[in-house]
Amino acid sequence: MMQGIGGDIQDSQLIREDNVTHSFCGLACVGWMYQKIKDSFFLILGTHTCAHFLQNALGMMIFAKPRFGIALIEEGDLAKNEPTLQEVVSEIKADHHPSVIFLLSSCTPEVMKVDFKGLADHLSTPETPVLFVPASGLVYNFTQAEDSILSALVPYCPQAPAGEKKVVFLGSVNDSTAADIRADAEELGIPVGGFLPESRFDKMPAIGPDTVLAPIQPYLSRVALKLSRERGSTVLHSLFPYGPDGSRVFWEDLAREFGITVDLREREAAAWEKIRKQTDKLKGKKVFLTADTMLELPLARFLRHAGADIMECSSAYIIKKFHAKELEALQGVRVVEQPNFHRQLEDIRRERPDLIVTSLMTANPFVGNGFVVKWSMEFMLMPIHSWSGVVSLANLFVAPLQRRSMLPAFDESVWLEGAMPSAEVHA
């Protein structure tokens, strides 16, 4: 159950180190954002590396005509002042008829100092806006590219009049989860203004000075701050709605913003009971979370309240005000921003956690050394929000533990034999 909600942020053992994140670049957000905004097209100005990444990561064949594409930078483009994309954009309009085109930056053109904002403005028309989205891996974690997309959409959200008090949920979720969240709000008597983003460009929610913004993803601090400053909206600072504990606090805090007092402790208890079999398997398990998705804080909080022992929770970026409630709920837990991965490796080898939640890039080496691993990317792609997502969330953690329990004893040599012949010679 809930513990530590009233403590100071300083009580969390918050440490900042100096490492880069072993994670995808922001282009990965295309995988879920193009499916969410159904009348959009995502155009990336990038290199062959970007093309290979998206082709492999998203598993799309070219004949499927997905609503994203890459304008390749070749050697000859390095001598040009600015890339020419007018023909590409005209082809996109003819083939896909999008209502909006998002122009995403990548590492190489950013190093070349391409004026993406000016390029997008030049390509934009009243009928089909072209919006610049900074998405390279030079600055942002891959989930923060969604933050950039939502920030680009702000000018296209209508102005809600003063006195119209409704909640707008910030964050991309599938249509089924959005319907569940809307139903949960309406059941509590909370008027809903919509979601940012909605599934169509012309359906973006009206936002004004009396709008309450409820972030449902922990990596959307910039768009929340932008709307607060530009529209005067109120940002809900609560736990994020992951797990029974987070869902209860989120909905109680949101209802309070509308002058509604609700007690959801019974519903929280029923949700914990619903996943008792899963939490029984998590109790006492040592879990280590490496930095990847920026979901790590709420995931660690859920695991802790489910009975797991959190050895370390690390995240690429931690924004103290935006993540305040999650940090309070993790007081006493070692929380690390921009962790040094080499130090983490030594800690993991020494402490031998029962479960490591980590990125796709580091998962296989951990498995090869005998550890049980959960891909952190999976939490991005599954419906794990609010009450309807409780079972899915718990199952994601339990599945690798159950799988390992059904396998024969791990033979490390099967993975490592011949991997480093030079090491064998000197052994």
UniProtKB/Swiss-Prot annotation:
Keywords, A to Z, come to:
4Fe-4S, ATP-binding, Bacteriochlorophyll biosynthesis, Chlorophyll biosynthesis, Iron, Iron-sulfur, Metal-binding, Nucleotide-binding, Oxidoreductase, Photosynthesis
GO BP terms in the entry: light-independent bacteriochlorophyll biosynthetic process; photosynthesis, dark reaction
Keyword Iron listed? The answer is: yes
The main enzyme category here is oxidoreductase
Note on cofactor: Binds 1 [4Fe-4S] cluster per heterodimer. The cluster is bound at the heterodimer interface by residues from both subunits.
What Pfam families does the record tag this protein with?
Oxidored_nitro
Subunit details: Protochlorophyllide reductase is composed of three subunits; BchL, BchN and BchB. Forms a heterotetramer of two BchB and two BchN subunits.
Listed PANTHER family: LIGHT-INDEPENDENT PROTOCHLOROPHYLLIDE REDUCTASE SUBUNIT N
Q: Does the keyword Cell inner membrane apply?
A: no
Its Enzyme Commission number?
1.3.7.7
Q: What biological function has been recorded for the protein in this entry? A: Component of the dark-operative protochlorophyllide reductase (DPOR) that uses Mg-ATP and reduced ferredoxin to reduce ring D of protochlorophyllide (Pchlide) to form chlorophyllide a (Chlide). This reaction is light-independent. The NB-protein (BchN-BchB) is the catalytic component of the complex.
Q: What is this protein called?
A: Light-independent protochlorophyllide reductase subunit N
Annotated family: Belongs to the BchN/ChlN family.
